[in-house]
């Protein structure tokens, strides 16, 4: 039976030290920046991926390790209801498989993007997409939740053609069940019982890690669970509860893996959304996900970004829902360091911060430092490392180009372990996320401003690729056409 293990039990493996505890007595404040911000990166290609008439958001990105021209991105898709959308490219992002009528993961919802074609799933709503590839590139993976009544389930779909087609669903071609949940009458998105924000990581040995937060319905309790597959996604072990005790109001769990040792590092935040909690944690597995160390606090938010109206909205301007402060981890195999980027409000402006630790002692972290200090809010960050060179790549929604009023996307990169940074404006036109949204029949203006809770970035030898939510042409009465955008940027 999988269980939690103590930090001391894995000291001999070199992953953690004896002096660890659930929480250290203090955490350093952000360090003063001492590096360049003046350089710009190279060529930028921006493409509208979804190219349709209604909203998408939450845009994870994965690249085929055997064919870097093949990438997939997922989304929450509002074309028919709220479901799980997908697009694939086979030319490095210049063109993508269409959203309509077939850019949809079958087997989850009762509908598809084609009103004439019913879905092969049983769920009324789907969401929270996550994507990955197998180490040999032969299989693409897509996970998302399905919701119907009191019941929620997390499913994994597979593609053997780079994302053109996916597991058909239905009794003859079922998806793989990762885990199932019963909400006991509590609605999705309420203060009740529901799972949220899964992610997916595939290690070089093929092990698949899928963590999520599970809101229990008891105040702010939302421990992190993780399910692991050792057979290419055909089945999953019973989920393991990673966080416990006083570390229980958690969210935004992600896993990165050291390719040399196979050790898995799971990071999460201590439930910033709604203003609860202030800390970032890491847990380690040295046995391919069977057991996990106690959670170790490696950083503390000073004033976390929280964009979840009406509960919280702590930057200037009209309110909208968007990513708050969460940890984005990446592993550098050239230095054996675990990096984590996150946003925090420092001196009144939301900035990107970076901290790291040598995995020989995961309790010793660098002092968090502001990355390429900005004149406007940077309200979220995604992080990736190019494994051959150790180049650090970040993307963020950035209000620095408009007097801290409108959104753009910035790409920020470092080739010297964060000593200096180059920043590139990726978007050409700024926009106001409070003026666009997803369809909402119960909202006074017909929309709910919501650009999703995460974006996507991957690092290639000669470029970084990224996906995000941005505005499209309005069709009809309401500005509900949020699109998936892709960019490739040369460092």
Outline where the language-model segments fall.
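Bacterial N-terminal signal peptides that target proteins for export
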Residues: 1-9
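Residue-level signal for mature regions of secreted extracellular proteins and peptides
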Residues: 10-14
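C-terminal motif of bacterial Sec signal peptides marking the signal peptidase cleavage site
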Residues: 16-19
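Bacterial signal peptide processing site
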Residues: 21-23
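Extracellular, repeat-based ectodomains that mediate carbohydrate processing or recognition
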Residues: 26-491
């Amino acid at each position: 039976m999988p269980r939690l293990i103590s930090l001391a039990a894995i000291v001999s493996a070199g992953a953690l030290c004896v002096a660890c505890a659930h929480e250290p007595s203090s955490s350093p404040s952000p360090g003063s920046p001492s590096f360049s911000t003046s350089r710009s990166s190279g060529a930028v290609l921006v493409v509208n991926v979804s190219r349709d008439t209604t909203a998408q958001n939450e845009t994870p990105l994965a690249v085929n390790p055997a064919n870097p021209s093949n990438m997939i991105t997922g989304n929450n898709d509002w074309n028919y209801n709220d479901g799980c959308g997908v697009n694939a490219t086979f030319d490095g992002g210049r063109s993508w498989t269409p959203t309509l009528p077939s850019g949809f993961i079958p087997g989850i919802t009762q509908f598809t993007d084609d009103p004439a074609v019913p879905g092969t799933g049983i769920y009324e709503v789907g969401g929270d997409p996550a994507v990955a590839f197998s180490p040999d590139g032969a299989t693409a993976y897509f996970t998302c939740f399905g919701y119907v009544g009191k019941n929620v389930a997390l499913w994994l779909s597979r593609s053997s053609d780079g994302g053109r087609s996916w597991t058909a669903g239905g009794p003859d071609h079922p998806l793989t069940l990762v885990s199932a949940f019963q909400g006991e009458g509590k609605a999705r998105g309420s203060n009740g019982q529901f799972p949220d924000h899964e992610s997916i990581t595939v290690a070089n040995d093929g092990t698949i890690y899928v963590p999520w937060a599970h809101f229990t319905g008891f105040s702010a309790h939302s421990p992190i669970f993780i399910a692991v597959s050792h057979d290419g996604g055909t089945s999953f072990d019973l989920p393991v509860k990673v966080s416990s005790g006083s570390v229980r109001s958690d969210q935004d769990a992600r896993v990165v893996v050291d390719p040399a040792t196979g050790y898995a590092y799971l990071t999460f935040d201590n439930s910033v959304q709604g203003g609860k909690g202030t800390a970032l944690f890491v847990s380690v597995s040295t046995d391919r996900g069977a057991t996990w160390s106690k959670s170790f606090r490696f950083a503390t938010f000073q004033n976390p970004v929280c964009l979840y109206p009406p509960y919280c909205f702590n930057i200037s301007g009209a309110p909208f829902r968007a990513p708050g402060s969460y940890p984005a981890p990446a592993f550098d195999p050239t230095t054996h360091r675990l990096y984590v980027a996150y946003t925090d409000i420092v001196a009144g402006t939301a900035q990107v911060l970076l901290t790291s630790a040598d995995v020989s002692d995961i309790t010793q972290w660098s002092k968090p430092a502001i990355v390429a200090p900005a004149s406007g809010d940077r309200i979220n960050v995604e992080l990736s490392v190019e494994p051959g060179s150790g180049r650090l790549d970040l993307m963020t929604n950035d209000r620095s180009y408009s007097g801290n009023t409108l959104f753009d996307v910035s790409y920020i990169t470092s080739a010297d372990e964060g000593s200096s940074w180059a920043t590139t404006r990726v978007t050409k036109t700024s926009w106001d996320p409070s003026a666009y949204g997803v369809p909402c029949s119960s909202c006074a203006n017909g929309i709910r401003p919501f650009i999703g809770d995460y974006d996507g970035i991957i690092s290639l030898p000669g470029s970084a690729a990224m996906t995000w939510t941005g505005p499209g042409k309005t069709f009809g009465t309401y500005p509900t056409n949020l699109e998936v955008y892709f960019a490739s940027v040369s460092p």
